């Protein structure tokens, strides 16, 4: 019976826009067993991909509203589902595995969970989640790399931050997972920046607006790629990603998933006359899009994700970030609902 509830949960997760593809080894079931108790799996599998009032859910699962709310709130504290409250009424929905349940597993991330995640991603999980479009995340450029008159409103990371009311930092689940399997990353662990839209997010450490702005500068300085949810409005976080740990960038560098992240509407160019061949840009590029030819750096535009780290770090200004021509610009979905609808359509699913 307990195995059956995990099968039900896996199927429910795969019907969400993000997807939770099955594998030939069934490692995804072991993964769910590690994270959810049988009761939690049963409850989660009976939720939908839309926010519903607790009364509706309670009737469906055969519990009183009070008992259902107590159990669901406790699950929400551990990131096992999504929760919202309007006035005195509670709403819940099934959370995607990625981005959702997985990112909330910082406290439970141990050697076993880390290896299960790695096996799942490497054996079809990453491809099944990252290949469907629109992508989960999109790249936004380093602030110092783009002239203000060229930056698009939804690509302005500082403007996104300043429109929020509260701020927090938390550890990066990707680096935490990689550390457990023996990969030591040189970048800091606490690099995920959260805004007011996700103020209930577990494991977040509250910081001030000034600290958040300073952190964005620091992330760019040390060479981390800004990525956000692939929407124009309602952005709740900025991930600061490295190519060795970040799942979506590893999609490009390790698993051959070229569209695992939506590229920024910019591309890097390096002036061969100005380049002194110091290699700083090659070291800062997280997706290996820059190589050396005849003593100078050259950008492979097909690989360039437009993050601008080469331009912001070039000691003599040889590397620059340019906006793509108008016919190459790609606008992200307006909001999360539009993103979900487009993704469901592209996966041949409906709500």
Model regions: which residues?
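Glycine-centered, phosphate/nucleic-acid-interacting loop/turn motifs that mediate DNA/RNA or nucleotide
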Residues: 79, 223, 279, 288, ...
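Short acidic, hydrophobic short linear motifs in intrinsically disordered regions
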Residues: 50-61
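Basic amphipathic alpha-helical segments that dock to polyanions
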Residues: 57, 68-79, 219, 241
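Ferredoxin-like iron-sulfur electron-transfer modules
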Residues: 94, 227-235, 255-306, 324-327
